[in-house]
Amino acid sequence: MGGGSIVPPLGLATNASYIPDRYDVMIVDENVKQAIYSDADLVAVTTNTITARRAYSLCKEFREKGIPIVLGGIHPSVMPEEAGRYADAVVIGNGENVWEELLGDFERGRLKKVYRPETFDLTQSAVPRRDLLKGRYFYDSLQTSRGCPFDCEFCSVTRLYGGEYKYKPLDRIRKELESLRTRNVLLVDDNILGVGKEAERRALKLFELLGEYGLHWIGQASINIADNSEALRLAQESGAKAFYIGFESLNEDFLRAANKRQNLKKGVSSYKDVIKKIHDHGIAVLASFIYGTDFDTRDSLLRLVDFISESTIDAASVKPLTPFPGTRLYERLKQEGRLFNDHYWLEDPYPLFTFNPKKLSLQELTEATLNFLDIYNPLNSTGYFMRSYQSTQSMRASFIAFLVNISDNRTYRKYIRRHEHTLARRFGIDQWRRQKHREVDIVIHQK
């Protein structure tokens, strides 16, 4: 926090658009600067699980100053009792249609402990208050739909949106497009194409609309987008430069257990073909993978390292499987008594691992983490750029992938260094192995 951010906090800007004009509203993005302790009458904080401990600390500081606190976001929505210990009011779910009631209660001095607004109608969505975003961002952000048609065990989107997949009308999206402050845009929709003929027709119309504004955009998609050549063509023509795609694993047993059915339908053997089809339309592939599952072995993780290195993926994000509260994965591991800490997000620092996989020792899991450091080596980022350009023939798409690699590089290494002493104590490691390149030289001695 206090460092920088690539995209602005769209949720805060969206909620601000529903606050009456009689209020002076300030948005503070802690990814850009620390919170300002001013003479605010009311403070609303949004948080996910990773930032929950910091959010609770903020709540304590504001409440000590006598300023009422409202907590919202995905973590308070799935852990309202916990969040309620730190806030005067907790908003569960979408916040757009809660502000009239909440502010009325605030003015009467009778804030409720919990607000559960009805499902918000996206056809009534307002244009986010981007004028309140004071940070400098490389990308603007835009949401055209909510929810995801899939229900993966490790994902909390279905819990938050109730399995619904809803769209904003195109005329509403047009108004938002006209309010953007840059042509570089991140579409934060969980799945830009969706599933089924209706969803696909809607996506094609969306791409045509985006094409009117000369954008360079990044979106999130499932591997099924590779089967729709028309969608890829229109996406390319509308300015798509990269897709985040959750490949997740090379192990189909894990994909089956996690209900990642969209990947199972095509099969792991299709991954390289999916990548090629997207590349053929000048779009980079920003792939995400998960490790530390109950189906992983030391050998399978080495194969994953080889696959990422040998495939034509433009950028790879490899993270340990984390059971976020609100997911079926969290509930299952908690019931099985396998979580190291049921409230691990309150630990300082935020833990690297939260449970022990069935087929990996903690020593092997740690070694795998170090192996993935090679993927994030700065020298490899340069190689990825050259490979990306050869695959996409798009300088901008390759540059975007390069920036993602550099950002992940910094984040991943900082994360590892933050945990070096904790890892040494927990896993009894005598010494981290040296990495191929000298700038990665972390040595830890057993205590």
Where are the language model's segments positioned?
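Radical SAM [4Fe-4S] cluster-binding motif and immediate context
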Residues: 126-286, 291-293, 299, 306
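Acidic, low-complexity intrinsically disordered segments
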Residues: 1-184
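Structural detector of well-ordered beta-strand residues that form the stable sheet scaffold
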Residues: 70-71, 91, 113-115, 218, ...
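Flexible glycine/acidic-rich beta-alpha junction loops that bind and position SAM and/or redox cofactors
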Residues: 82, 196-197, 253-258, 291-299, ...
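Radical SAM enzyme core and accessory elements
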Residues: 21-27, 106, 338, 351-447
